Amino acid sequence: DPFGSLDLVEVERSADGKPVSVRVAGWTVDGDTRDPLGVLVLVDGKLVGNVAADKPRPDIGMALPYSGPNHGYDAIVAVDPSSQVLCVTAGGVGAGLPFVQLGCKVVK
């Protein structure tokens, strides 16, 4: 099963305080592979971004040596001004769960 963390959620807002974009960052690995995983970004249940968790994260490589160091993700996604909740999900490989939620954050 994939696992990991949603470490950062930064909301950029318009002059009237509505969200316009969100930066998400964190990491994810799956014990069934050393390859980077795909990360889905959903807002109010709708897919708004699909990124690879392939950025350098030496801390993850040291903590989980079997995984290697390149399992970070960092992306900015556009969101609708009426957006409420952002969730990040990792896609797994091999046996186990195909998707695991890494975290959610209210962005309204």
Q: Language-model segments: which ranges?
A:
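Basic, ligand-binding patches in group-transfer machinery
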Residues: 1-108
